[in-house]
C-alpha cells in the first residue's frame, strides 16, 4: 500500500478506511459503500486473484490511483464462503451512521470478523461436518490442545503427551483453523494445514486463560469442569477463547462449559490407523466407500456430525455402550415412524448457536418453530418404548410449548431471508406495527382513487399513477396529452413517450407512506431483537434438547442400519479376546456385486496372534480390516456385521497396512513403514488390537524377514497384543511351533492351469504356496514374462533345495541362519569390561580382536 505520504494527504473517506485497515492488517477488509463491499490497495489485488473479480482503480488519494475491487452486498455470502474455504479471514465493515445526517464520511465500524474456524452462517458451513477452531500449545512436558465448535458451543481440551498422539488428535479433529504460538517448536507437525494463525505468546499465558474461562462460565474456579490440573490444555483454551471474543464481538452465551478429553476414556487410534481404516475419509481423500458412508443414514445434519464424532472416538465405558445397544434394539421396530418426524427437526444445534450470537435470521426462527412443532409427535412415539435410555432422551427433549406458541404468534409462515426486508413479524402480534403497516398498505386504494379522480376531472385517458424506487410516486401522462395538465402539476421526469408529474397532494401522501414504512420497519427490527431476549433465557435447555434429538437420530439410524444390513448385537465382555462368527466387512459387502464370504475369527490370551498367509487379492487385508471395523462399531454401541460377536476390553487399535512415500518429509516407503511399526511396538499393550500387513517388504529379503520375525516375536511374547499378522514370508508360518499363543490361518485359493480362483475363505493352517505368478498373470503381465518367471522359480527352488521358500531347520530359519551366528569378535567384546583394563592390556586386546575378525 502506498502510504509514504502523510496521512492527512488522503481524502477523508480514505483516512477512515486506512484507520480501520490498520486495526486488521493481516486480513481482508470488506468496506461497505452503498450496495457494495469494496476492497482497496493490496486487499483489492489479493481479492481479485482469489475471487476472480475485476481489479479497477478509484480516482486518486494522496496523489496515487487507488486499486479497487468490490462485491455486491446481496451476494457477499457466496464470496465469503469461497474465501473461507481458501483459509482466508475477512473483517466486515458496515455503515452504522445515517448518510443523510452525516457531515463528511458516514460512520463505519467492523461489526464481525469471519474466519474459517468461527463461522456460524449456514451458507458458509458444511452441514454434515463439524467446523472446529483449535489452538495448540507446547512446553517441555508435552502438548496442550483445545477445540471449539462455535456452531454448537462444544469446547474440549486435551493434553497429548507426545508427537504421535498430537498428530492423531489433529487428524481426528481436522480443525478448519489452528492457532499456534509464535515460538511453536514442532512446526513440521502443523505445516501445510489450512487456516494456520500465528499468535503472540502472551495469549497463551496460564493465569490469563483461567481468568478468561472463569469470566465466560461465571465461575470462581475450573475444578467443576475437571480441567483445573491441565495447565497446557488451559493455555490453549485461553488463547482460543480470546480469539473468538476478538472476532465475534458479541457475548457467547452458548459456550457454557469446557470438557477434558482423556485418552483412557476412549479407544486410541493413531493418525495412520484412522487413515487406513477409512472411517470418514477414503485413502483418495473422498467420502465414498468409507465406514461413515455405510452407517450414516441420519436424517438431521446434527445427527450426522454426532455419529462421525462417535466413530472417531469410540468409548470404553461399557455401561454407556449397553445403554446404546438397548436403545438400538428397542428402536428397530419404530425407526420408520420416528425418522420422518426427526427429519423435520433440522439443524436445531446450529440455529441455537446463531441465536446465541444474535445472528439468527428470520428463517432460522421459522425452522426453530417447525422443530418445536415436531416434539409432541416425537414424545407420543417414544412414550411406548421401554428402553430406559430412550426415555432419558425423551425427557431431555422437552416440550417448549410456550416458545412454540410465541414463535407461531410472532413470525409469519414463510418469512423473508433478512429482517431488513420487512414482513417478518406476523399480523396481530403487535398492535402499533399493524397500524403503521395498514397506513403503508392502504396506499394502493388511495392511488387507485386518485388516478380515477384526476383522469375524469382532466379528461386525460392516458393518465395513471405509479411508483418507482428512485423518483417515488408520480402521475404519468402521454407526451401527446401533456399539454392538457393543469399548472399545479410539477414535472418530475421526462421519458421518450411520456411525462411524469407530482402534485402537492401526492407529495404529502408520499411522505406519510414512506414515514409509515420506515416506522414499521424500525419497529419490526425492535420486535425481532426482543424475540431474542425472550428466547435466550431458555438457551441451556434448548441446547440439551438439541443434543438429545441428535443422539436419538444417531441411535434410530443405527437401528435402521442394523435391521436393513443384517447386523447383530455384539456381546461386550470383561474376558480378553475377540470371537466372531460369520464376520463381514461393512463397506466391502456393500460394493461387491457377488455375495460377500463371511469368515470367523478367534483371538484370546491362548491364541493371541494369527499368522495370515495366502495369495495377493485373496482377502487378507479385507479380513484384517473387517475385524478392526467390527471392534470399532461395537465400541460406539452399534450392532455389527457378524452373526455373533464377543469382544473383550480393547484400549487401542493399531494398523500397519500399505504405505506410500512421504516425499514432503523426505521419508521413503520403508521409513514410513518402520516409523509406524516403532509406534506400535512402543505403545501397544495386551489389550490392543494390532493389524500388521506385509511388514518388512520394503527392504531386502534377509532384512525384511528378520524384522518381520522379530516384530511378530515381540508382539506375541513381550507385548501379548491381539495381533493379525499377514505375511508372504512363509518362514513365519513356523512361529506357532516355536512360541505359545500363535496360530496359522490362510485365505483359500484354487489354481487351475494358468488361472486362479480366490475362495476368500479363512482356513486354519498355513497356505501351501504364494500364487504370486498366477496373480501376476491375472493382472495382465505378458505371458512370456510369466513363462520366464516360472522357469526362474524352478531354478531358484532347485538351487536352494526349496529352503528359501518352505523350509526351516531344527532350530532356526535357513534364511536367518547367517544373521544369527554371532561373530567371535562380538562375543569377545560382550565379555569385556573396559574399566578393568590397563593401557597395556587395552592395546593387547586390540591386536587380539584384529585376529578374530
From Swiss-Prot:
InterPro entries (UniProt xref): DNA_mismatch_repair_MutS, DNA_mismatch_repair_MutS-lik_N, DNA_mismatch_repair_MutS/MSH, DNA_mismatch_repair_MutS_C, DNA_mismatch_repair_MutS_clamp, DNA_mismatch_repair_MutS_core, DNA_mismatch_repair_MutS_N, DNA_mismatch_repair_MutS_sf
GO biological process, one term: mismatch repair
GO molecular function: ATP binding; ATP-dependent DNA damage sensor activity; damaged DNA binding; mismatched DNA binding
Record PROSITE patterns: DNA_MISMATCH_REPAIR_2
GO cellular component, one term: cytosol
Residues noted as binding ATP in the record, renumbered to the chain: 614-621
Keywords for the protein's UniProt record, in alphabetical order: ATP-binding, DNA damage, DNA repair, DNA-binding, Nucleotide-binding
UniProt-listed SUPFAM superfamilies: DNA repair protein MutS, domain I, DNA repair protein MutS, domain II, DNA repair protein MutS, domain III, P-loop containing nucleoside triphosphate hydrolases
Signal peptide (from-to): none
Similarity comment: Belongs to the DNA mismatch repair MutS family.
Role of this protein: This protein is involved in the repair of mismatches in DNA. It is possible that it carries out the mismatch recognition step. This protein has a weak ATPase activity.
Protein's name according to its UniProt entry: DNA mismatch repair protein MutS
Organism (species): Cronobacter sakazakii (strain ATCC BAA-894)
Lineage, top ranks: Bacteria, Pseudomonadati, Pseudomonadota, Gammaproteobacteria, Enterobacterales
Gene that specifies this protein: mutS
